[in-house]
Amino acid sequence: MKNKYYPLRSSMDELSTKNDNEIDLEKGPLPEYNSEDGSTLPPYSENLNLKDPKQMGANNPNLFNTDESTTPPDYGEDSLSTTHRENHSSGTADNSCASTLKKAILSFIPIFVLNVSAVCYLTYKDALFKDYGKDEWVYFGMWCASCLMILISLWCFYETWIKAVKVTAVFLAQCIKVTAVFLPQCIKVTAVFLAKCVKVTAVFLAKCIKVTAVFLAQCVKVTAISLAKCVKVISIGLFNIRREMMIIIWILWLIICCILFGCVKDGRLNFNKALICSTCTISAVLFLIVSSVCIPIWTLWRALSGMLQVLGIHGIIAVLVNGSMSLFGKHFGWRGYEIEGFVLFFTSSALFLYEMERPGVLKRMRNTTGNVIGYICGVIGDAFRRIENAFRGANDNNNIPLGEMDVEGEV
């Protein structure tokens, strides 16, 4: 049995022949066809629409049963085309109606949601139209036109926005799923991390407090030692400095205080009573420090005795000033504080200058004051004793009998 090849030609092949054998862009150039040996298939033979079942059977004998005992069904061209057309037309009509209805519903849903949201918002804001006039109808028409344009756009670009909605929904679902899985892990990791942080922070704070306490103790110790050394060095320096320099420093301080009191007296500066008292206190303290360094006073007892001595002198002056003001019947106001300040300041200045010229005069003054007070008290005591003896002698003379007086007179 010889293999016969029946060339299959369709309307597409004829159209290709008429168009000068145009090349299919998907398949590429046509392969060479050798009709003698039949080894090469005709061009694009697998994509031919074979409508004749007889030719299909001739090319492939196994496609249909050619047994003589069995009568093959009659696949006529009319019967095949009629059946295929009926099935295809009925399925296409049903699918097109369903897809059109689905497309219309899905395109109308966004417009419906938009209008419902707008009505709810306007109702909440109490901005719905109450009286439909010209402007209201214009606004309503523009709104309807906008909704119609949106509906047409959704209808025309149905596939695009449906795909976008599907992709967005899938993405949101994945995000929610990932978030639901990831959040417990994050919470667990965060809780563990916070617990570790709290533990580490507590340990670190305890160590910091301990180190800070030790450091502060060392700082206080070093500061106390440094201050003691500074005071000692300053005291030795002041003790070794020339006496003229100390006098110049005190004179400068005296000039500053005099200028200050002069400004207060003139009225250019409105200082209160506390300023004068503080100035006097500063002068007294400065006098005490300088005099203590120059004497010098190195022990606490001598420092306290010198301070009490200066304060005692100031107290005596204050009592005398207050007593004199009270005797003259004047109120102790601004004038009294001013007088007291001047007296205290100049007293401190005089004592300082006197101490600088004659070192140890305060100590001798204390002894001299005690001796003078003792001498005054002794003189007063002697005077009282003499007065007492005089009164006692007068009383003895009054107690003599009259007879003895006559005898003494005769003798």
UniProtKB/Swiss-Prot annotation:
Superkingdom of the source species: Eukaryota
Asked if Protein biosynthesis is a keyword of the record, the answer is no
Q: Which GO terms describe its biological process?
A: meiotic drive
The record's keywords, sorted A to Z, are:
Cytoplasm, Endoplasmic reticulum, Membrane, Toxin, Transmembrane, Transmembrane helix, Vacuole
Quick one: signal sequence residues? none
Is Membrane a UniProt keyword of this protein? yes
Q: One Pfam family this chain carries? A: WTF
The record lists the membrane-crossing segments as: 104-124, 137-157, 244-264, 281-301, 303-323, 336-356
Basic and acidic residues composition bias: residue spans: 11-29
What's its job?
Promotes unequal transmission of alleles from the parental zygote to progeny spores by acting as poison/antidote system where the poison and antidote proteins are produced from the same locus; the poison component is trans-acting and targets all spores within an ascus whereas the antidote component is spore-specific, leading to poisoning of all progeny that do not inherit the allele.
Describe, as the record does, how this protein assembles with itself and its partners.
Homomer. Forms protein aggregates. The two isoforms can interact with each other and with themselves. High sequence similarity is required for their interaction.
The name this protein goes by in its record = Meiotic driver wtf33
Q: Which organism is it from?
A: Schizosaccharomyces kambucha (Fission yeast)
